C-alpha cells in the first residue's frame, strides 16, 4: 500500500494505491491521524480510485477517521 498526501487548506487528501488490509491498516491510520493532529485538519478526502482490495481492517480505518473528523466538526469524503 502506498499513500500520497495533499493539503488543500484545512482539507487532507489521502490518495491510496494498492490493498488496504491488516498488514498496513495500522500504519495508514497512524499517518493520517498524525497529519490531522499536526496540521489541524478538519476535512478528509480518502481517494480509493487505486485501491484494489480492502478487508475489515480497512473498514475500521475508514470508520475511525470518520468519527475523528466528525468530532472536529468536519466532513469526510471517500
What are these language model-derived features?
Residues 22-78:
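Amphipathic alpha-helical interaction surfaces in cytosolic regulatory modules
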Residues 1-15:
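Short beta-strand/loop segment at the start of cytosolic alpha/beta domains
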Amino acid at each position: 500500500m502506498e499513500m500520497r498526501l495533499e493539503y488543500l487548506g484545512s482539507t487532507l487528501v489521502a490518495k491510496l494505491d494498492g490493498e488496504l488490509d491488516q498488514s498496513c491498516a495500522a500504519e495508514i491510520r497512524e499517518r493520517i491521524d498524525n497529519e490531522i493532529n499536526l496540521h489541524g485538519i478538519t476535512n478528509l478526502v480518502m481517494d480509493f480510485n487505486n485501491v484494489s482490495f480492502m478487508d475489515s481492517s480497512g473498514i475500521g480505518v475508514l470508520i475511525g477517521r470518520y468519527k475523528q473528523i466528525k468530532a472536529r466538526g468536519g466532513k469526510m469524503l471517500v
